[in-house]
Amino acid sequence: MPLRVIPAARLLTLIPAFLAAGAVEAAAATARPNIIFLFSDDQTARAIGLENPEVITPNLDRLAREGVRFTHHYNNTAICMASRCSVLTGLFEHRHGCNFEHGDLQRRFLEQSYPVLLRRAGYYTGFAGKVGFDLKGEKFETLAGFFDQWAGGPGQTFYETEKNPGIAKYAARYPHSSRAYAAWAADFLTAAKASGKPFCLSISFKAPHLPFTPDPQDAKLYAGKTFTRPPNYGVEKGRHLSAHARTSRAATGYREWINAYDESAAAYYALITGVDAALGMIREALAREGLAENTVILYSSDNGYNMGAHGFGDKVLPYEEASKSPLIIHDPRLPAASRGRISTALTGQVDIAATVHAFAGVPAPGGIDGRSLLPLLDDPAGRVREAMPLFNYWGVSSAQSLAIVTPSWKYIFWAHGGDGLRPTEELFDLAKDPHEMVNVASDPRHAAALNEMRRRYDAELAAIAATRVEGHGYEKYPVLFSRTIPWTEKPAPEKGSTAKGKRKAGREEN
């Protein structure tokens, strides 16, 4: 879809003023929207007020009512490092190669990321918050040079503002980092306006990632409350699932969601309320600077979170709670009739970059996996794809998987055949069973659907073989994930990568 621009008649009336001010750049800046991308950490799709009234998110709710909310938004890899690189580049994990146990991001991929390309095209750019990855062979500080303003932090960053150098000066007023990032953003907006350029700002909050330590002013809103468990809550609601999933850290750790659900939910939701408050602060700053009417806001999260569904904590797994997160796109230039709509189209984290490029009118790199979502703003009932792959290339071999999701079905193949496990298929009728309570893979009534999803799976596996990046350990997956090659003919997993092996990443690593 073409980029929306100022009507020609109005633009003609502004030309004299532009010429007097020295013109062409100002006209281009006015025609191109400003773009803000806000990114939470570990926020599952139902953890906003419009999905769950127990979560206090008035600003997110308002953003959705004034924009378009996407209810089938998937994280192509449901873990932070890979997801963040997919957001920046528009590439699936096996194409950019960055994840735990697979390696750091190569510079050539960062140089084709949306912030770098928009800056090259004349945008004033800024980044604050958790980066979540390193550049291969380079110091972390190198990343700052790709932006006009920088307040990014290595590792997990901290909830305590004073411990994050890029925002430490805001600690006295905003001791918790979520609101401090909004204060930094307000100063960025002032500088961006003074630059005379359109801007692209990306903020990556730590919240609501573990450890659950919310701002006290948000925590008190949830103190002592009892929260509704999801329909698929608890270990008993996961007995029907593959034994492979039970070998992942989502099953073996994170027991707070089983042992102390209300306390965990209170802290988790309070952290999200803090991010919501930051969104409100940023929108107030946009209004003060006179930038609100030409600034697009996108909001999402790097992955979902299980919250005790099927007895799981954490993320990583391909089930709905871990693999889906919110996506809201707010374009103030949308006509009133197009606001407040809900799109059920399949979207993914790889689509963020393509969408930002389309808003900015800056061509996206050729061959990326993402697709622009701008057509869905005008037609939320439309589609940009028919199926979406979900990858887990990380962690114990027994819990790694490839899944395919369509608007109605999800197919998961658990390939591991060692450690007492057998390769297993799961098929869920998402239209009738959104909580994934019945695996219908062996039900002959669904044989046609199973065969179609197998076909899509095999095609995706062939694409992995054809497009994977070299040197990051993905060459084994076309064989390991094959449905047709017997387990006994596949290469043995590396030492320490099985369910009985040593886990390489702990609770706080990602």
Task: Give the location of each predicted region.
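N-terminal secretory signal peptides that target proteins for export/translocation
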Residues: M1-A8
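Bacterial Sec-dependent signal peptides at the C-terminal "C-region" and cleavage site
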Residues: A20-A31
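Bacterial N-terminal signal peptides
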Residues: A9-G22
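Active-site-proximal cap/lid insertion segments
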Residues: T30-P33, D42-V55, G155-R179, F188-G348, ...
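Active-site segment of extracytoplasmic enzymes that catalyze sulfate/phosphate-ester chemistry
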Residues: F37-F39, T44-F127, K136-G137, Q149-K163
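Loop/turn elements at helix/coil->beta-strand transitions in domains of secreted/extracellular proteins
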Residues: A31-I35, E66-T71, R120-G126, G145-D148, ...
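Low-complexity, glycine/alanine/valine/leucine- and proline-rich hydrophobic stretches
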Residues: S401-E425
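Polar, surface-exposed loop/tail segments
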Residues: T57-P58, V87, A121, K130, ...
